[in-house]
Design a protein with these regions (language model features):
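Active-site-proximal alpha-helix that buttresses catalytic centers in soluble enzyme cores
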Residues: 1-314
């Protein structure tokens, strides 16, 4: 609980993540007086269920370290002694500050920032941009900087997703229905111009096309809503509760917007939402893991980085 509280304070204080209507001080009171006194205990219990499931400690951090190691290895093979790779997170550690300080100490003059969010959203990728910009404000010599905004339309990303589905189904069989669940955003963010849901639609359509799915064999949904405001629909939990009554009793779920498994996939989808589905009459539920450190995923990310060095001589 003590470890979760500072993380939640940092996360929920990010105005990219939570855009409270003015006056903002009302949200600060709610956050500090209510949420930070209730939420940490619940979140801590959830984290206990996923701790050490993918190595030591947080699954997200463990997988991110694997990804970093594999990408570093691939870059070294393809361009020896040309790249340094650092891992940074917007909230918690290793921080964005420590990652950029590491690159600065190694004399890096050209930096590519790759947020591991396939679909751009102001509340995710936008926060990464803000964190990087904040740290670079302190640099005397600002580096050449390239920022990869999104990669949801890259063919190799779609191929990796399709391969992960096929690999899973080769072991567990095909379901009646495939649900593609993405992290949700409040509808008013979309109304203000955030095209994240449109990118999710494109990913869903292309993946379904790659898997040769019929329209009645798949659906897109959004998870992790918070509070009482309307979020982008359809909601994942409500969708899973309704599927058995429609004859879909063997369901598999994939979360294409997560490059690494974390609390929201392992606990929220494969445990909590599985429970909703089974309690509603479902018979078989499968969660298809995130791309994590799959070789085809690492190969794609490595090539994406190399492609974004175009025009840099050294």
């Amino acid at each position: 609980k003590k470890a979760v509280k500072p993380y939640l304070r940092q996360f929920l204080s990010d105005t990219r993540v939570i855009e409270p209507p003015p006056p903002r001080w009302i949200w600060k009171i709610i956050l500090n007086a209510v949420i930070l006194n209730l939420r940490p205990k619940k979140s801590a219990k959830a984290y206990q269920t996923v701790w050490n499931t993918h190595g030591e400690g947080s699954p997200l951090l463990s997988i991110a370290k694997y990804q970093k190691a594999e990408i570093t290895s691939q870059l070294e093979k393809r361009a020896p002694a040309q790249f340094e790779v650092a891992l940074g997170m917007c909230y918690g550690n290793p921080s964005m500050k420590s990652a950029l300080a590491e690159l600065e100490s190694k004399g890096c003059k050209k930096i590519i920032v790759l947020p591991l969010y396939p679909q751009y959203a102001a509340s995710s990728t936008g926060s990464v941009f803000d964190a990087v910009a904040k740290e670079l404000l302190t640099w005397r010599n600002v580096p050449d900087l390239r920022f990869i905004r999104s990669y949801n339309e890259e063919d190799k990303y779609i191929d990796s997703l399709a391969n992960s589905v096929k690999d899973y189904q080769n072991v567990y069989g095909k379901p009646d229905f495939l649900l593609m669940s993405y992290h949700g955003i409040p509808k008013r963010y979309f109304d203000k111009g955030d095209n994240y849901p449109c990118q999710c639609c494109k990913t869903t359509f292309r993946l379904a096309q790659k898997l040769d799915l019929k329209p009645d064999e798949y659906q897109m949904s959004f998870q992790s809503r918070l509070g009482f405001a309307e979020w982008m629909k359809e909601y994942t939990d409500q969708t899973l509760k309704a599927l058995p009554s429609k004859g879909m009793k063997n369901v598999q779920v994939i979360c294409p917007g997560f490059s690494a498994d974390c609390l929201e996939t392992i606990e929220e989808i494969s445990e909590e939402n599985k429970g909703y589905f089974m309690e509603s009459g479902g018979e078989k539920f499968g969660y298809i893991p995130a791309l994590n450190d799959r070789p085809d995923h690492i190969e794609f990310l490595t090539q994406l980085l190399l492609d974004n060095t175009y025009g840099w001589n050294n």
